[in-house]
Amino acid sequence: MRSSTISASAVVLLSGLASAQTFTDCNPTEKTCPSDPAIGGLQVTDFTAGKSSYWEVEDGTTMSYDGTLGAQFVISTATDAPTIKNIGYIMFGRIETWVRASAGTGIVSSFILESDDLDEIDWEWLGANNAEAENNFFGKGNTTTYDRAQYPAVATPIDTFHNYTIDWTAKSTIWYIDGVAVRTLLYDDKQTVGGKNYPQTPMLVKMGSWIGCASKAAETDSATAGTCSWAGGAVDLTQGPFTMYVKNVTIQDYGCATEYTYGDLTGDYTSIKATGGCSADGSAASPSASSSSAASGSSSSTKSSSGSSTLSTVTGTTSAIAVGTATGTATLSAGEKATAAAISGSTTSSSTIAKVTTTSDANSLKKPKHEYGMIDLGVMVLGLGLGYLVM
């Protein structure tokens, strides 16, 4: 994500998105910080079914949900920066989402992975560019250069939903659009400075939209001119509202934990401690996926109409991050079941996300169902027989 020196008020305004490389509540490379709650398995969110308990709404954010278009991130005024964040972290993983970016010069739509020590992996879209998406990364908050971004072509990302995927492992990070790899970043790529700037610490998924250039004056202000140039110029709010849409998000945590802890101040992935075992409601997949499964949604153009219904409206308040009810159960929505089924059984790609059952949980995490074969049953019977003889 493009960053520049910004005022304290702007930091609040951008709700943690634009300032991602320069701010963290507690930096584990500087001091001991609290452990991060882990997703620890597969999490599926279907925003066309309404609000999800697996996402927290940031202060000042009002969200609406549409039965066709999903979550709506709306900018109408200069102080709007709608943002939501997941309740859990991943330690390497695969993240897929169906997004239709917001229009509007100066408007930025963002989908990012961010860690406590300022590692970051991005998908972003500029409202003035209806032909490209942007992918980027940062390590340990290093913003000394802005030469890491790439802009792969994508057909009308502002008018059309597309599948955007990040597959993140200790060896590489791969960005996909509609199942096609558009960038591969190796751990030891020259831009990572021998791996030092390679993102490698527990990540939290955030998404939202924000104003990259608030006014004509900002275009010439030395503190904001760089971001204004990147965002395409000043926003004209009279042309709004400007809306980013997200249909769904699928997160596979490759770690096996209920929480992740930094073992020292290095920020190296080998120092991260995973504790608690896999989630009681999900199991991590192998971190070797090689392509994207365009499982849910459609690549065809989707237009908003006056007939579409808003399911609900939610206003954000501050709350602590929590893993949720790992042992609790709840009924999945029809949309979540369909999404999970598509991911596990009806894709044509070589995604290694494990096949899962669609029995429920409070975090859309699915636990693989164990099946016993004849040999297993035979061993059980033999064991019971021997136990009887001993008695």
From Swiss-Prot:
It comes from the Eukaryota. Disruption phenotype: Does not affect development and only slightly increases sensitivity to Congo red. Leads to a weaker plant cell penetration ability, associated with impaired infection cushion formation. Residues 361-391 form a propeptide. Chitin binds at E124, K206, W210, T227. One of its GO terms (cellular component) is side of membrane. Residues 1-20 form the signal peptide. A lipid is attached at S360 (GPI-anchor amidated serine). The keyword Lipoprotein applies. One of its GO terms (molecular function) is hydrolase activity, hydrolyzing O-glycosyl compounds. The region from residue 93 to 127 is sufficient for the plant cell death-inducing activity. This is Crh-like protein 1. The gene is crh1.
